[in-house]
Amino acid sequence: MGDYVPGFEQRESDNRSFGHSRLPTLGAIPIKNEKGQTVMQKVKVSRYVAGKAPEYARNYDSDSSESDRETDRDDDRRRRRRRESSDEEDRRRHRRHEDYGRRRQVEKPEVLGKVEDESSENEQESEEDEEKQEERRERARMRRLELHENNREKDEEQEDSAESDEEDFERRRQMLRDRAIKREEEIKREIKEELEEDDVEEEEEEESSEEEDSDEDDDPVPRLKPIFTRKKDRITLQEAEKEKEKEILKKIEDEKRAEERKRESAKLVEKVLQEEEAAEKRKTEDRVDLSSVLTDDETENMAYEAWKLREMKRLKRNRDEREEAAREKAELDKIHAMSEEERLKYLRLNPKVITNKQDKGKYKFLQKYFHRGAFFLDEEDEVLKRNFAEATNDDQFDKTILPKVMQVKNFGKASRTKYTHLTEEDTTDHQGVWASTNQLNSQFSTKRAGGSRPVFERPATKKRKN
């Protein structure tokens, strides 16, 4: 790629002699090819990728790259040692803090004598309070120091992570996040323990003051160190009585529930018995003759008799059909042998018998036609003898009195017809398009009509072709 840069993109910093040449910001630049022609060539934008050397840095000597790698390795080792030392310091500080938290000693029960001087006790209590306050201040100071060191370590680790690659950065960030979460949990736990200790100390002070009041008697009484009991573990006489009352009420409710279940079960048994008795009564009332039901246990004699009856009916039906066919054939032969006059006289004296014969009725004006049908008319049926020409629905009205426009079928509907009926239309009109003589009709008749096509062939040639 050439070093040509358009004039309107020229900058003072582009004329530098050090480093890689600045790439133009256009999508394509004009360059000269091998033939000397000026053509446009696309600019390949080189993007920065973490951990990958740029294009202009690949031509350097291998010695310098190896030395750079060694320095990078040394830097990584230093950072790793620094992190390990900081982690070890954190663990040591955490261990010291835990030991300090466990430093509170549990004293054994002791026999205390009678308090003689109240002023000495008050001074001792004030000294103990000051020691506790000093311990709290020391713990707070330690926490502040730890937070300050943690923040400083976070800053150092962030600087180190910015120099390393993305994987190390992610790993260190996760470690820092886990460490911060652990520290927050430890701080919360310490605060909670301190609050519990304060509560315990206050309760112990109250109990000790009560015991001191009770110990003002003449005879000294040995006293044990009071033990703190949680509120949920404390049981008083009132609570014990309430628990007994609850148990008694629960027993009474259980007894009532058991009695209700007994009554419900008795009602259910009674209902089932009644249903069984009703079913038995229905069986006795609706008892049928089981012999009328066909089963597979019939005897062979009964099956044979039934088959014999069916076979006799079939033979009789076939014989009647043969006799009827023979009679019709004989009658046809007789009619064919007669003369025309004899045939007319015979048909007049012996008319043909038509089953379900129906007289054709008269249809009204614009009445809808229904066809009776043509099948299964050889059997006598009252339905087939009805008058199918009888008007129904709208056909019962006289449509001759309607205006001429309304004398069409389905008037006012999408399926209405244009014409009233065929008898009112003139079908002999020769003025239509199909009857007029034009070029299209003449061409059609010339090509398709027989004998009208011009033929310019000699008969002799036609014979030779054949």
Swiss-Prot record:
Detected in intestine, pharynx, vulval muscles and body wall muscles. InterPro entries: MFAP1 (IPR033194), MFAP1_C (IPR009730). GO terms for cellular component: nucleus; U2-type spliceosomal complex. It comes from the Eukaryota. It is found in: Nucleus. One of its GO terms (biological process) is mRNA splicing, via spliceosome. Residues 1-245, 251-270, 422-466 are annotated as: Disordered. Residues 434-446 have a biased composition (Polar residues). Residues 58-77, 97-117, 133-155, 169-192, 234-245 have a biased composition (Basic and acidic residues). Disruption phenotype: Developmental arrest at larval stage L1 or L2. RNAi-mediated knockdown results in aberrant splicing of tos-1 mRNA with increased intron 1 retention and exon 3 skipping, leading to increased expression levels of tos-1 isoforms 1 and 2. However there is no obvious recognition of the cryptic 3' splice site in tos-1 intron 1. Its main location: nucleus. Residues 118-132, 156-168, 193-219 have a biased composition (Acidic residues). Keywords: mRNA processing, mRNA splicing, Nucleus, Spliceosome. Involved in pre-mRNA splicing. Belongs to the MFAP1 family. May be a component of the spliceosome. This is Microfibrillar-associated protein 1. The lineage of its organism: Eukaryota, Metazoa, Ecdysozoa, Nematoda, Chromadorea.
